[in-house]
Amino acid sequence: MQTFHLLTRHLPILEQDSIGEWMDLNHDDDPLGDSFIPSFFVYSPAVEKFIADVYHFAAVCPEFHMKKHVQTLQNNSITSVFDADASTLDAHCILAMIMHVIRGERFREGYLADALQHGHMKNWLERLTELEK
């Protein structure tokens, strides 16, 4: 049974596709020089689909309690998802880390991009693949 296929199917796409780019809408030619628009990250369609599938998985598989990702991380003494050793964690923890990064994007622009660029998301999805065997 492939419980995590909705998420793990994105592995090849996330490895090959450009994840997106930073957008900076500020211009040097602003006549007043007083307007400022914070930079933001625009994700590729493949990453946007992955994000949508994470939320869909959380909705259709409530037994993983992904909405309580912070509590799951705290209960497992995970203070930094980027420093945690995924090879020793169960599916609940891996899914909590994935949701933590997706939700964290709302508070820190580019948080998901960091997880993708540094291979953390790839490692977590590979761990879910291992756990399915």
Ranges and model annotations:
Residues 7-11, 115:
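Eukaryote-skewed repeat-based solenoidal scaffolds used as protein-protein interaction platforms
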Residues 75-93:
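Short, charge/polar-rich alpha-helical segments
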